A protein has these predicted regions:
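GST-like domain detector, emphasizing the conserved glutathione-binding G-site
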Residues: 1-121
Length: 121
């Protein structure tokens, strides 16, 4: 596995925090957003959305989106169970994570995107 990452971006940071809590190390590939590497044909072939993080699985499958990546990692490395161990715990974790994404992180991401020279036309 490899994690396509950018150290200063908030979403990849969430995955790195998750990995640290799990005590799992995965090789990282830096995608420099300031240099617009996320818009290169090579990266768009990996993730047509042009966003990080992206987790490349050993079979060549690519996962994007923090929650999908973290849920996969939680299933592959079940201890500690950060998404919970029961269906109720897992559903509550996903519910609150989605609320944070939809009501908090999206607004912050738009501000950062509009302030960043790497995203200007």
């Amino acid at each position: 596995m490899r994690l396509f990452d950018f150290g200063r971006a908030p979403n990849p940071r969430r995955v790195r925090i998750f990995l640290a809590e799990k005590q799992v190390e995965i090789p990282r590939v830096t995608v420099n957003l300031f240099r617009r590497e996320q818009l290169s044909p090579e990266f768009l072939a990996i993730n047509p959305g042009g966003t990080v993080p992206v987790l490349e699985l050993d079979d060549g499958t690519y996962l994007s989106e923090c929650l999908a990546i973290c849920q996969y990692l939680d299933a592959m490395h079940p201890e500690p169970a950060l998404f919970g161990t029961t269906p109720r715990q897992q559903a509550l974790t996903l519910m609150w994570a989605n609320i944070v994404d939809n009501e908090g992180m999206s607004a912050i991401a738009e501000v950062l995107r509009n302030l960043s020279p790497g995203f200007r036309d």
